[in-house]
């Protein structure tokens, strides 16, 4: 078998038969078996040698690939009978060709691209090496933490004011909204006290009032809500006013200054058509009625006078307090007219009583205090009579006529003979002892007899103790003072805690 891989570019005569072609058109191969009996000797003109022909070679099988066939023309072909032989043995080129061109092609060139398989059997050929993907096996790691946010710039600390924080209910300093009144009220601190500046309908007006007061109280360096240049006119006016006077001016300008239908404080229009003046919240009372007046000004002046009497120069008035200097009593007179409101009952010394005071109307001395041991301890001191004598302006219970209680018994002041007789007998052993200061004595010039003690039954429990009796006896007035008091043309009631009650005196008389 001989494999011919040489193709003759020109001169190779091939005889193709269209019937012998394969229908697939992909590849053709034919194995030609030459037999000795059927083989013919090539013609003489085809050979270039004149020697006799040699015997034919043994039959050979030729494998021919159609893809290696050239496109030479078939003009030099012999007869149809010699097709198979010519295909097996190619004829030499014609004489007119100077040389024979042979082209050798490699079946599997090394530099050629990968061969194409006609049957497209991709699984029979190895694929060209492909770049392997970069596959890495990593251990499971926690997800990376997100980057921390950039640090926010810290706001600068607000300047701490010297006057405390701003109000929670208002954006202005010194202004607070009160739900009870429905107004914006302004206050300022001065010397540890909160000063009321007035109530206003708007927070802006209240802030203006605070700024004026702050400039007056603390100067131009005060912390205010608005610009200092807005208050140049106010600063010129406030130079001639004191703090109290300027506060009064601010209060009069406020909305909450006046109440009712009048523009003046403490003045309202009565249903009868006149103007009523009254002052509120004094000594626990809701208001104090001051009277009806024909004009608002008169009612306002009446209110101002009452406010000054009760609150002094710090009172809030409709007009300047200086306008009432000639109409109001002086401070010394007001202090002399003060009433001692200590809760205890004491009798002034006889030297303090004068006919002018005796001719006055009924006066009652009321003392706020306690009946506890403080008074009894004070009564044990030897200086108790001098202390009582040094207290001026006492109001004893004085009458120009003898009391009628001696003839008509009273449930609180019983006046029976047994009680008088028992009290006289109890007083006889101590003739030289001074009269107690804790007694209500009945003294009158119509009765030359010794003064009778009117016992009080509701003090019997505390007066029956021996300690209280001795204390009262040691702190009493002298006998001369008692005699002088009895010589006056008045009747004085004194309470004696040592005097027994009616029930105790009756029991004492029964035992005797």
From Swiss-Prot:
Record carries keyword Transcription regulation: yes
Biased composition (Low complexity): 42-51, 460-492
GO molecular function: DNA binding; DNA-binding transcription factor activity
SMART domains: AP2
Main location: nucleus
Residues in the DNA-binding region annotation: 171-227, 263-320
Biased composition (Pro residues): 141-154
Expressed in which tissues: Mostly expressed in roots, seedlings and leaves and, to a lower extent, in stems, panicles and developing seeds. Present in spikelets.
Regions of compositional bias (Basic and acidic residues) in chain numbering: 127-137, 418-430
Compositional bias ranges of the Polar residues kind: 21-32
A single GO BP: regulation of seed development
Expression induction: Target of miR172 microRNA mediated cleavage, particularly during floral organ development. Repressed by SRT1 via epigenetic histone H3K9 acetylation (H3K9ac) regulation.
Gene Ontology annotations for the cellular component aspect, listed alphabetically: nucleus
Disruption phenotype: Larger seed size and increased seed mass and yield. Enhanced expression of starch synthesis genes in seeds leading to increased seed amylose content and altered fine structure of amylopectin. Decreased proportion of A chains results in abnormal round and loosely packed starch granules but reduced gelatinization temperature.
Listed Acidic residues bias regions: 78-88
Region Disordered, residue ranges: 1-100, 119-174, 348-367, 401-433, 460-512
Location of the protein in the cell: Nucleus
Keywords: DNA-binding, Nucleus, Repeat, Repressor, Transcription, Transcription regulation
UniProt motif Nuclear localization signal: location: 159-168
Transmembrane region(s): none
Motif range (EAR): 341-345
Family statement: Belongs to the AP2/ERF transcription factor family. AP2 subfamily.
Subunit structure: May form homodimer. Interacts with TPR2/ASP1.
Function description: Probable transcription factor. Involved in spikelet transition. Regulator of starch biosynthesis especially during seed development (e.g. endosperm starch granules); represses the expression of type I starch synthesis genes. Prevents lemma and palea elongation as well as grain growth.
Name the UniProt record assigns to this protein: APETALA2-like protein 1
Organism, scientific name: Oryza sativa subsp. japonica
């Amino acid at each position: 078998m001989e494999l011919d891989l040489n193709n003759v570019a020109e001169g190779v005569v091939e005889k193709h038969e269209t019937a012998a072609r394969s229908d697939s058109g992909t590849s053709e191969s034919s194995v030609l078996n030459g037999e000795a009996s059927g083989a013919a000797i090539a013609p003489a003109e085809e050979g270039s040698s004149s020697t006799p022909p040699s015997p034919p070679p043994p039959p050979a099988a030729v494998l021919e690939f159609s893809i290696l066939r050239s496109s030479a023309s078939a003009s030099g072909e012999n007869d149809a009978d010699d097709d198979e032989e010519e295909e097996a043995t190619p004829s030499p080129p014609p004489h007119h060709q100077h040389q024979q061109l042979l082209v050798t092609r490699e079946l599997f060139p090394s530099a050629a691209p990968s061969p194409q398989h006609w049957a497209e059997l991709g699984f029979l050929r190895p694929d060209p090496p492909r770049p392997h993907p970069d596959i890495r096996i990593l251990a499971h790691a926690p997800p990376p933490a997100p980057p921390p946010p950039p640090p926010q710039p810290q706001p600068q600390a607000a300047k701490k004011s010297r006057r405390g924080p701003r109000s929670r209910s208002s954006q202005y300093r010194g202004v607070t909204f009160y739900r009870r009144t429905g107004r914006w009220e302004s206050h300022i601190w001065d010397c540890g006290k909160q000063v009321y500046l007035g109530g206003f309908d708007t927070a802006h007006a209240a802030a203006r009032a605070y700024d004026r007061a702050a400039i007056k109280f603390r100067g131009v360096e005060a912390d205010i809500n608005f610009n200092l240049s807005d208050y140049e006119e106010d600063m010129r006016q406030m130079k001639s006013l004191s703090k109290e006077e300027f506060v009064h001016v601010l209060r009069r300008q406020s909305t909450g200054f006046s109440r009712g239908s009048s523009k003046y404080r403490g003045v309202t229009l009565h249903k009868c058509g006149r103007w009523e003046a009254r002052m509120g919240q004094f000594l626990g009372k809701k208001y104090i009625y001051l009277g009806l007046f024909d004009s608002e000004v008169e009612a306002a002046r009446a209110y101002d006078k009452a406010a000054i009497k009760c609150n002094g120069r710090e009172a809030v008035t409709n007009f300047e307090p200086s306008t009432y200097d000639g109409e109001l009593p002086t401070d010394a007179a007001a202090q002399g007219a003060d009433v001692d409101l200590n809760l205890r009952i004491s009798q002034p010394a006889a030297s303090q009583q004068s006919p002018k005071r005796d001719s006055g109307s009924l006066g009652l001395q009321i003392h706020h205090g306690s009946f506890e041991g403080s008074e009894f301890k004070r009564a044990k001191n030897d200086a108790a009579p001098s202390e009582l004598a040094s207290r001026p302006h006492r109001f004893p219970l004085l009458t120009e006529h003898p009391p009628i209680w001696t003839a008509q018994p009273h449930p609180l002041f019983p006046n029976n003979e047994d009680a008088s007789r028992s009290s006289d007998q109890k007083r006889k052993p101590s003739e030289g002892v001074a009269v107690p200061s804790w007694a209500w004595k009945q003294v009158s010039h119509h009765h030359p007899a010794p003064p009778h003690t009117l016992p009080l039954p509701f003090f019997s429990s505390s007066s029956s103790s021996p300690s209280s009796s001795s204390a009262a006896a040691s702190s009493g007035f002298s006998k001369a003072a008692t005699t002088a008091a009895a010589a006056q043309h008045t009747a004085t009631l004194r309470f004696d805690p040592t005097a027994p009650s009616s029930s105790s005196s009756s029991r004492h008389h029964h035992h005797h």
